[in-house]
């Protein structure tokens, strides 16, 4: 397979390494990655790679589909909450997979994967992806109800169909899959990253600037764009372009609740909270997805933000200006929030823990520098 528009990210590098450890050949030329799976000879992902990347659990459905067995350890990733994988395992069991959990390892085996009816108690993106990957080569039909509706699910379904799968209903709450005997290689262009796009909109908005984003899908960003409009920014939306002009002083957001798509994404909550720290008035953030996604609050407070957290709610009272400080990113999106806040702060801000930011942002300092930011990496 050849994947285009594949960013340089720490998580992508780790994914490439997982594939190579499994026996696949991976070649990158710029933003094009080619994967040859014909030499795949292993069905186990080593613990050190699983520990570093939460999304590594998505390999489970694909490996069991191909090899009829798989061994992985419990995944790691950013420390933003419990994020149990029971939904993933329940979905695979519905397809006839026997799963044993022993000493931190997940051992899966089956004689054959058989289509079934999978109901997700929560519309988990990862569990939906795992179910899709396992079911595309199952015998018979599979129906996934209460499926995640995120644009990334649509993108995965389109990619699988390019390889010969028969998946329909992506983007809705019911996905139907007719199993095929095997998939074939394909060339596919990965969708633009809507969270990265929204982060750059936040970076421009907090400085009262103007920005033009190209190669984006505005239709996938509705909830985020509505919040920006409520804060007083001006937006001009074109097919694959967003042009934003921000006021000198942003308005408060009032109440933002993170929800599964098409609601407001949990992944952009932190950068938008950075916006609220210097907005006029009080904003309230209610985090409904992860129970530990306010780790950036203490660091923003070090910069002079006025934020009070109680349970899953954070009340942000806008201040006139933030002050530069030494802060530390403790997870990916919280790190992005610190970068956004630092752009508008008086003085110099030094951000540690940049390895978290590199998990989800390609050369963030390069693109911000091109937009006029004073930023460098040491």
Which ranges hold each PLM region?
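Short, structured segments at the rim of ligand-binding sites
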Residues: 1-378
């Amino acid at each position: 397979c050849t994947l285009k528009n594949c960013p340089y990210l720490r998580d992508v590098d780790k994914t490439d390494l997982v594939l190579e450890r499994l026996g696949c050949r991976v070649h990158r030329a710029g933003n094009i990655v080619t994967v040859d799976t014909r030499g795949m000879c292993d069905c186990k992902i080593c613990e050190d790679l699983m520990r570093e990347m939460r999304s590594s659990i998505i390999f489970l459905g694909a490996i069991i589909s191909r090899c009829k067995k798989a061994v992985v350890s419990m995944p790691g990733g950013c420390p933003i909450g419990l994020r149990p994988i029971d939904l993933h395992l329940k979905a695979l069991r519905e397809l006839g997979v026997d799963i044993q959990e022993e000493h931190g390892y997940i051992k899966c085996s089956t004689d054959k994967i058989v289509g079934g009816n999978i109901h997700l108690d929560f519309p988990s993106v990862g569990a939906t992806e795992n179910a899709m990957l396992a079911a595309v080569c199952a015998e018979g039909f599979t129906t996934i109800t209460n499926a995640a509706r995120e644009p990334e699910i649509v993108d995965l379904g389109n990619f699988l169909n390019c390889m010969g799968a028969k998946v329909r209903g992506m983007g809705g709450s019911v996905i139907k899959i007719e199993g095929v005997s095997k998939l074939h290689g394909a060339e596919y262009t990965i969708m633009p990253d809507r969270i990265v796009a929204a982060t750059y909109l936040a970076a421009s908005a907090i400085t009262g600037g103007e920005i033009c984003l190209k190669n984006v899908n505005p239709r996938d960003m509705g909830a985020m764009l509505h919040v920006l409009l409520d804060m007083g920014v001006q937006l001009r939306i074109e097919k694959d372009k967003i042009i934003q002009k921000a006021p000198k002083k942003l308005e408060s957001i009032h109440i933002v609740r993170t929800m599964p798509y098409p609601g407001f994404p949990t992944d952009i909550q932190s950068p938008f909270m950075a916006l609220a720290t210097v907005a006029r008035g009080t904003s309230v953030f209610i985090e409904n997805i992860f129970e530990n996604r306010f780790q950036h609050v203490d660091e923003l407070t070090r910069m002079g933000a006025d934020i009070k957290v109680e349970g899953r709610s954070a009340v942000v009272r806008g201040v006139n200006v933030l002050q530069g400080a030494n802060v530390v990113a403790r997870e990916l999106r919280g790190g992005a929030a610190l970068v956004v806040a630092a752009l508008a702060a008086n003085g110099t801000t030094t951000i540690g823990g940049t390895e978290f930011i590199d998990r989800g942002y390609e050369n963030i300092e390069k693109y911000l520098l091109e937009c006029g930011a004073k930023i460098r990496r040491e």
